[in-house]
Structure formats: structure tokens, C-alpha cells
UniProtKB/Swiss-Prot annotation:
Lineage, uppermost ranks: Bacteria, Pseudomonadati, Pseudomonadota, Betaproteobacteria, Burkholderiales
Gene Ontology terms: biological process: translation
Known function: Binds 23S rRNA and is also seen to make contacts with the A and possibly P site tRNAs.
Keywords assigned: Ribonucleoprotein, Ribosomal protein, RNA-binding, rRNA-binding, tRNA-binding
Family listed: Belongs to the universal ribosomal protein uL16 family.
Name of the protein: Large ribosomal subunit protein uL16
Organism encoding this protein: Burkholderia ambifaria (strain MC40-6)
Segments for region (Disordered): 1-24
GO CC entries: cytosolic large ribosomal subunit
Length: 138
């Protein structure tokens, strides 16, 4: 699963996920892309589950690019622990997703195969997504 190798600080504040993606919002590597329409967080497990679903569907052909990386640690306190006594330990990592962000890209497959693979992947994600075809000349 994806997670940072090392961080300057172990814990991070919650913050607010506002605005829309101004970077990473176009199909750059492949011919087809899965773009986020909604806003939210994707955990490393969700990113991996969607990747597996796509990889299984396209079998040997094609290439997949993951355009997002979970670099924000989410901390949790253990069950049945009283409030206070500091912040909990980092449990997992998430990628903050803004509308317009390209999540995955694919190349080397037909459009209908890519469309179906992205449909299977989108079912694993808690966001609304759209299938994007690379524009010629872009």
C-alpha cells in the first residue's frame, strides 16, 4: 500500500478541503482518465482496491498510472480511551481529493475496456467520478 517513506512530522492537523484542483486535472500520461467530480478523502486501501479492480479487468494489456498519493496521516485514539491525554497515533494515510483531480490514467487498451475498468474502479471509491478521454493535440 502507498504511504510516505518518512515525514518531517508524524502528525498533521485536520485542515479544510476547499476549492477545486488546479493542478493534476488533465490527462497527462495515458489516453483515458478517471477524474474526481466530488470532494473527499481516499485512503491508501481504497486507492489500492481500485487499482486491483482495474488491473484484473484489463489483464495483461495496457498500462495504469496512479495520479494521487496518500500523504496525510490520520490519527485515531484506541477504543474506550478517555478524552484528553494528547492526540492519538497515526493509523492510516489519505489523499485529499478536490473536484477536477485526475485519479487514474490508462493507456494501451480500447475505449470500452478502459471505460469498464474505470467503472469497476469507481465502485470501490467513495467519490463521484467521470471517465475522460484525452483530447487530440492536448
Amino acid at each position: 500500500m502507498l504511504q510516505p517513506k518518512r515525514r518531517k512530522y508524524r502528525k498533521e492537523q485536520k485542515g479544510r478541503n476547499t476549492g477545486k484542483a488546479t493542478r493534476g486535472n488533465a490527462v497527462s500520461f495515458g489516453d483515458f482518465g478517471l477524474k474526481a467530480i466530488g470532494r473527499g478523502r481516499l485512503t491508501a486501501r481504497q486507492i489500492e482496491a481500485a487499482r486491483r479492480a482495474m488491473t484484473r479487468h484489463i489483464k495483461r494489456g495496457g498500462r495504469i498510472w496512479i495520479r494521487i498519493f496518500p500523504d496525510k496521516p490520520i490519527s485515531q485514539k484506541p477504543a474506550e480511551v478517555r478524552m484528553g491525554n494528547g492526540k492519538g497515533n497515526p493509523e492510516y494515510y489519505v489523499a485529499e481529493i478536490q473536484p477536477g483531480k485526475m485519479l487514474y490514467e490508462m493507456d494501451g487498451v480500447t475505449e470500452e475496456l478502459a471505460r469498464e475498468a474505470f467503472r469497476l474502479a469507481a465502485a470501490k471509491l467513495p467519490l463521484k467520478t467521470a471517465f475522460i478521454v484525452r483530447q487530440l493535440g492536448a
